Amino acid sequence: MSNILAVFNPPPQRELEKEETMDCVPCQVMSTMFSVGFGSYLASGKPFKYGKKEAKRGISLTEFEKRNPQWWKVTLRSFGGLLIAFGFVRGTEGWLWHKNKEYKNYKKLSNDGETQAN
C-alpha cells in the first residue's frame, strides 16, 4: 500500500517493540544540530533584516516594518532561544545527564558480507 493511501486507510494498530521506540545517536545529533542552528538563525534576528532583496522587490522600509511587527519579531526570537536551549538539552542527554539511557544498536555490513552489531 502506498504512503498516501495509508493516510486514508491506516493499517491496524499494533504494539511497538522496545527496539522500535528507542532513541538513536544519529537522531540525537541531527535534532541537536537542527535545533541549535535554526534557533540561532531565529534568535539572531536575521529573518527581519531589511536588505537589498526587499528593496529590489519594491518593498519600502515602512512596509517591511508593517509586515514584521514588533510582537512577531519578539515571538520568533524567543522561540529561537527556546530551540537553542532544547538543542543543548537534547545534545547533552546521555552523557551529562540521564547517563543510563539506552540507544538502538545498528548492524553494519562488514567487508566480508556478514552483519556485525555496533
Curated annotation (Swiss-Prot):
Keyword Mitochondrion: yes
Any Gene Ontology CC annotation: peroxisome
InterPro entries listed in its UniProt record: Mitochondrial_unc_protein
Mitochondrion among keywords: yes
Keywords: Mitochondrion
Other facts: Present with 752 molecules/cell in log phase SD medium.
Name of this protein: Uncharacterized protein YDL157C, mitochondrial
Organism: Saccharomyces cerevisiae (strain ATCC 204508 / S288c) (Baker's yeast)
